[in-house]
């Protein structure tokens, strides 16, 4: 207790209630910080100190989903503005214009910078790495993007074993033509060269397909994939719109006269057609960049499917490897060996060529 003199009278101040209030506030703060981390995305990633040489794959999954979705918002914003500022990066091997737009650049900056800020020791490759980002971008981890699934474990790996592949806008040509159904943003996480986390986000329908091999997948992806495939289904091969010329004859030569062809754009979109059983295989006979296919490779693997080169080799996504897969690809959910056997026999009969 203490006494003060005021107007000649003695006033007694009791300090006990203030002490009790301070103690209660301290308990409330400690409880909030320790038991409500999942509800506080802005501080979630900062509350636990981690070994900087290790990477938490659960957090990386969260960040990958957020990156793809945030990149998608940039794509939508540019599309709505109709200020694409399109220019050409040159011609593809098929002689098709390879365009670049503000959507590619803005999505790249948001996606790569956001991921790099959270995981500074991880190597991240983006299709638009040459693009200069005029401002810094970042975001805090938001675990609510996993709300639709059961508990996902905390697994850590060596940061030096992790490689991230980012495609800020897949199917840019179709984006410029307003064929928005083909457009996706993608993130893939590879560990020791193998893809284990894949995210394919479709900005124009707002759906995100993601999977972590051996752990979990998004509800959307699970619902997209039918439980049972039709018995004795005739082959349906999805190929690129730019490869349509001659593709049907090639598909018939490899898989038989009853084959059907599904022409589409965007590697991410074509993988989702295989997942949904709208196609039984995705065939690509020329070179393709790894940021185009890594996320789809991980998703197919999580569902029990397979993606290989046309030489039947798994694709290595390690940091020391070339970013270009020069050996084509075959992606399936089922019957991969059977399809590969037919392809091999066709090549043998045509002096090792697929044309």
From Swiss-Prot:
Protein location: Membrane
Membrane topology according to the record: Single-pass membrane protein
Catalytic reaction equation(s): a myo-inositol phosphate + H2O = myo-inositol + phosphate
GO MF term (any one): metal ion binding
Record-linked PROSITE patterns: IMP_2
SUPFAM superfamilies recorded: Carbohydrate phosphatase (SSF56655)
Family: Belongs to the inositol monophosphatase superfamily.
Official protein name in the record: Putative inositol monophosphatase 3
Species assigned in the record: Drosophila melanogaster (Fruit fly)
Lineage of source species: Eukaryota, Metazoa, Ecdysozoa, Arthropoda, Hexapoda
